């Protein structure tokens, strides 16, 4: 990431006018500033509200209490926390090019940023494992993917990113070898997350490329198996066996639709975050010369992934739309609302 311009003109505005070593503020036209605030505030509000609907729906409606939905609930919680803890402060930093919240909170913010991003992709990775058993081994799915197993998934999805993020940032291992650059750009009001060559590669591999590759491999296998199942189930007489196959076909269709939806969620995640992680790897090798605005564009493209997930649920999950209607109309406050049917039961 580019260092702040150290050659100041007389018209330069500073983050802290009274400070001797203040960072310069980036001058932007008022119209551009207003547009940026509108877009980013809109994204933050949509992320908060959309993921809140997912959280309330799965937590409240008993019909949605399933292992897969518990994973989705936890992922929505991750996205909701991102919109509350990370995005508002990143918005001010991106637009004003200043950090007004102190050095300690800069570290905490950076930790939360890394942690929640990594937690999201870990959730998606475990959701792909869940879908693999649901489609490829449906007869044993209920006994293999239990609430206890999902609990282990959630423990790993949260604990590993927390240890990774806070351990890396507070140990400053990511700064070893980049001390001269850090000293050159140091000023009051600066909060940037810098990775040296080693940790730029390692962090991106751990948080994105490794679990992303696992997910892609799992979903390719799922789609291959789903196509084979579809070809095997064909028309036949209405015997007990045919009825059983019909039931299997209905179940397979339901699982296939759910898998396609979750694949879209994963695909959107990869498309949103891939540019940022490529930049994280390449920036140390090109002398940290990535333009600040390009860095912010890629960063916010990644944040928008947390905005898109509830929209995808709304497009593909009827239960989400019905739950949203019940929340908006206040029907959810009825005493028997938790037992409401949000989607038809399969025979």
Curated annotation (Swiss-Prot):
* Pfam families found in the cross-reference section: 7tm_1
The chain's disulfide connectivity reads 23-187, 106-191
Localization per record: Cell membrane
Which GO molecular-function terms appear in the entry?
A: 2-phenylethylamine receptor activity; G protein-coupled amine receptor activity; trace-amine receptor activity
- Coiled-coil annotated spans: none
Q: Which residues are glycosylated?
A: 20
**Entry's transmembrane regions:** 38-58, 70-90, 111-129, 150-170, 198-218, 261-281, 297-317
Which Gene Ontology BP annotations are present? Answer: behavioral fear response; chemosensory behavior; G protein-coupled receptor signaling pathway
SMART domains tied to this protein: 7TM_GPCR_Srsx
Q: Does the keyword Cell membrane apply?
A: yes
Task: State the membrane topology.
Answer: Multi-pass membrane protein
Q: Region Extracellular Loop 2 (ECL2): what ranges? A: 175-188
Instruction: Give residue spans on the Cytoplasmic membrane side.
Output: 59-69, 130-149, 219-260, 318-347
The chain's Extracellular topological domains, given as residue ranges, are 1-37, 91-110, 171-197, 282-296
Which keywords describe this protein according to UniProt? Behavior, Cell membrane, Disulfide bond, G-protein coupled receptor, Glycoprotein, Membrane, Receptor, Transducer, Transmembrane, Transmembrane helix
Q: What are the annotated GO cellular component locations? A: plasma membrane
Can you tell which superkingdom this protein's organism belongs to? Answer: Eukaryota
Described purpose of this protein according to its UniProt entry: Olfactory receptor specific for 2-phenylethylamine, a trace amine present at high concentration in the urine of carnivore species, playing a key role in fear and avoidance responses. 2-phenylethylamine acts as a kairomone in the chemical detection of carnivore odor and triggers fear in rats. This receptor is probably mediated by the G(s)-class of G-proteins which activate adenylate cyclase.
| Similarity section | Belongs to the G-protein coupled receptor 1 family.
Tell me what this protein is called. Answer: Trace amine-associated receptor 4
Q: Which organism is it from?
A: Rattus norvegicus (Rat)
Question: What gene name does this entry carry?
Answer: Taar4
């Amino acid at each position: 990431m580019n260092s702040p311009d150290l050659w100041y003109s007389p018209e330069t505005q500073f983050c802290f006018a009274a400070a001797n070593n203040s960072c310069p503020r980036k001058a932007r036209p008022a119209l551009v500033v207003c547009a940026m605030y509108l877009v980013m505030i809109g994204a933050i509000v949509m992320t908060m509200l959309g993921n809140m609907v997912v959280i309330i729906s799965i937590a409240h409606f008993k019909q949605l209490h399933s292992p897969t939905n518990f994973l989705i609930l936890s992922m929505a919680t991750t996205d909701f926390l991102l919109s509350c803890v990370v995005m508002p402060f990143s918005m001010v930093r991106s637009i004003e090019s200043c950090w007004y919240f102190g050095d300690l909170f800069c570290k905490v913010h950076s930790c939360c940023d890394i942690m929640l991003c990594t937690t999201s992709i870990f959730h998606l990775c475990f959701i792909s494992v869940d879908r693999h058993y649901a489609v490829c081994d449906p007869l044993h799915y209920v006994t293999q993917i239990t609430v206890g197993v999902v609990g282990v998934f959630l423990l790993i999805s949260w604990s590993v990113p927390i240890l990774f993020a806070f351990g890396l940032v507070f140990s400053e291992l990511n700064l070893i070898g980049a001390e001269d650059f850090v000293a050159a750009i140091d000023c009051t009001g600066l909060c940037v997350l810098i990775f040296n060559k080693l940790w730029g590669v390692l962090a991106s591999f751990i948080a994105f490329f490794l679990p992303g590759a696992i997910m892609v491999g799992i979903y390719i296998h799922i789609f291959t198996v789903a196509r084979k199942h579809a070809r095997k189930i064909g028309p036949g007489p209405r015997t007990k066996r045919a009825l059983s196959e019909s039931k299997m076909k209905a179940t397979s269709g339901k699982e296939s639709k759910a898998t396609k939806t979750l694949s879209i969620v994963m695909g959107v995640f990869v498309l949103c975050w891939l540019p940022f992680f490529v930049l994280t790897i390449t920036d140390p090798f090109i002398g940290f010369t990535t333009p600040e605005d390009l860095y912010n564009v890629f960063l916010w493209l990644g944040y928008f992934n947390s905005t898109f997930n509830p929209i995808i649920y709304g497009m593909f999950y009827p239960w989400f739309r019905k739950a949203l209607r019940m929340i908006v109309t206040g029907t959810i406050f009825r005493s028997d609302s938790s037992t409401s049917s949000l989607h038809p039961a399969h025979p």
